[in-house]
Amino acid sequence: MIKIENLTKSYRTPTGRHYVFKDLNIEIPSGKSVAFIGRNGAGKSTLLRMIGGIDRPDSGKIITNKTISWPVGLAGGFQGSLTGRENVKFVARLYAKQEELKEKIEFVEEFAELGKYFDMPIKTYSSGMRSRLGFGLSMAFKFDYYIVDEVTAVGDARFKEKCAQLFKERHKESSFLMVSHSLNSLKEFCDVAIVFKNSYIIGYYENVQSGIDEYKMYQDLDIE
């Protein structure tokens, strides 16, 4: 379970402070993959980043005894002056036991298919190469929850299929916290839904289709 208590997150803007969330309270159940549904700017990705520990709230708590990934495929955190291998080794030291380091590095090297570039500085990589390394690194470690923000596969058609197969394998063993513009992907991978509107959560739904229906309804109301 992930328990969110009195969570507040805001940003300074030229016109004053903008609140993404204010005193948010919600529980995410164990063993359930959750679809986060809402318009752009509703706070879905911000909440995922805070759950994953790469952004901090102004106040409040996120309480869990589960392991949670960083956003799958995140490539922005690599150190450009280090090689792909060195970046992977650095992360592996944080998330794996000493005796597992070689295995994790070999997994990413084989999966990302970067050849000689795996031992070259990240700053020489194309965006696609960074994405392949980021996806492989995300999948190298087992988590109770994977954070999936609009990314399920990268690269050419063959590599995308390879990513999709591994993605499905991880889904058999773990839960996803997922944001996607593809409602079909949300229905395929998620069990329940949380629907966002502006800076608050409308509700928690025991099946994804109910959440999608609610989302479509308030969209229609806003248009009218």
Curated annotation (Swiss-Prot):
Show the InterPro entries listed in the entry: AAA+_ATPase (IPR003593), ABC_transporter-like_ATP-bd (IPR003439), ABC_transporter-like_CS (IPR017871), ABC_transpr_TagH-like (IPR015860), Bact_Polysacc_Export_ATP-bd (IPR050683), P-loop_NTPase (IPR027417)
Please verify whether the record's keywords include rRNA-binding: no
The protein's UniProt keywords, in alphabetical order, are: ATP-binding, Cell inner membrane, Cell membrane, Membrane, Nucleotide-binding, Transport
Record: residues binding ATP: 38-45
> Its Gene Ontology molecular function terms?
ABC-type transporter activity; ATP binding; ATP hydrolysis activity
Q: Where in the cell is it found?
A: Cell inner membrane
Gene Ontology, cellular component aspect = plasma membrane
Residue ranges occupied by any ABC transporter domain in the UniProt entry: 2-223
Q: How does it sit in the membrane?
A: Peripheral membrane protein
Disulfide pattern: none
List the Pfam families hit by this protein, alphabetically: ABC_tran
Where does the source fall among the domains of life?
A: Bacteria
What are the TM regions of this chain, as residue ranges? none
Indicate the principal place this protein occupies in or around the cell: membrane
Gene3D superfamilies linked: P-loop containing nucleotide triphosphate hydrolases (3.40.50.300)
What role is this protein assigned? Putative ATP-binding protein, and an energy coupling component for the transport of polysialic acid across the cytoplasmic membrane.
Q: What's the family? A: Belongs to the ABC transporter superfamily.
Protein name per Swiss-Prot or TrEMBL: Polysialic acid transport ATP-binding protein KpsT
Q: Which organism is it from?
A: Escherichia coli
Gene encoding this polypeptide? Answer: kpsT
